[in-house]
Amino acid sequence: MVSDATVQKLADMFTDSVRNTCQGEVAILFSGGIDSTAIATVARQFTAPLLITAGVEGSSDLEAAKRTAAELNLPHKSVVLTEAEIISVYKKCYKIRRGNLLKVELMVPVFKCCREAARSGKWRILSGSGAE
């Protein structure tokens, strides 16, 4: 069993890590899942992060992220991807990360969210991706 002290130390380390990244304006690659929601919840103690989600029109993921962002009372932008955009960005990402098609596929929404963050003047980006 994990002690309360260990849980508190982990929570403190997590908070410190997010605080150290939240110098100035930040964006969070936001799915509305537990990892990105935890980051957003802590980040809002130090800044007003912009939550950004990418997906296709009508996606339940976009809707879930939008609802969770509203519950957190944080600004949220949805990046709606068309089939043509997905193919175009996939080709760009493939040039960056040849060979591992799954990683290239996962890069597409990240690429589009990072572009949106840059357009919004956010140069620090947090992500819960891979937290597990």
Q: Where do the model's predicted regions map?
A:
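ATP-dependent adenylate-handling active sites, centered on carboxylate activation for C-N bond formation
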Residues: V2-E132
